[in-house]
Amino acid sequence: PQAQVWSSRGCPYKCIFCVWPATMTGNDPDGTQKRSVRHYKPDYMEAFLTELMAKYRYRTIYFDDDTFNLGDKHVERMCAVMRKINVPWSAMCRADTIRMELWQEMKDSGCFGVKIGFESGNQEVVDTIVNKRLDLEYARQAVAEIKRTGMTVHGTFTYGLPGETATQMFDTKRFISTLGLDTLQESGTAEIEGTPLHTLRNSRSLAKYSGAKLDDEYVPELDGRVKYDRLAALLRTTP
């Protein structure tokens, strides 16, 4: 059995589809509200995890923070905690928020795998639609370094973003083929209420949100099944 825990709350990023700000840091549909991040203190995490493992006999720990590796100091402190706890662990991470050498430190403290959200393999989509602020070439290098340490990498991608073309979706498929991921999650875009993407779908306008780019190719579909079937058919074809 695996315990799912958090070492922080909040996220400073403003991805257009993310439900986290609406549920954890206040409803922020236009992307203008400041995003705060709170890290639990190492002493608290050590006591909490020690009690958790002793009482419920979990064998592994998964840190489901929106971004576990948000800054070198937090990762270094949590690695020190996990060395004391001495159980295998994994975490939800970004590819670009710590020094490359800290991936090895995570591995040495018991981390066996990370989950990373790329969302798209097309840089324009990442920059102007998702608003993820992620350099895909740097992310590719990070995956190579993570794999070098012996940790596994689970990658997540989403299709059907507003303004995303078929060619850009196929760019994602090609990008995936270059990463050497251990496992993969591909999803259709869901416009969840409270997110900038939901506001965009309903009004076709998101003037205050600087990350999204709306164009004539974006056709909101209220019937999720229709959207899913269309995406599935498209991705089965050969670019």
Where in the sequence are the language-model features?
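Noncatalytic linker/hinge segments flanking ATPase motor cores
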Residues: E101-K107, V130-E137, V153-L161, G194-N202, ...
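Radical SAM [4Fe-4S] cluster-binding motif and immediate context
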Residues: P1-H154, R174
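C-terminal accessory regions of radical SAM enzymes
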Residues: P1-Q4, T167-P239
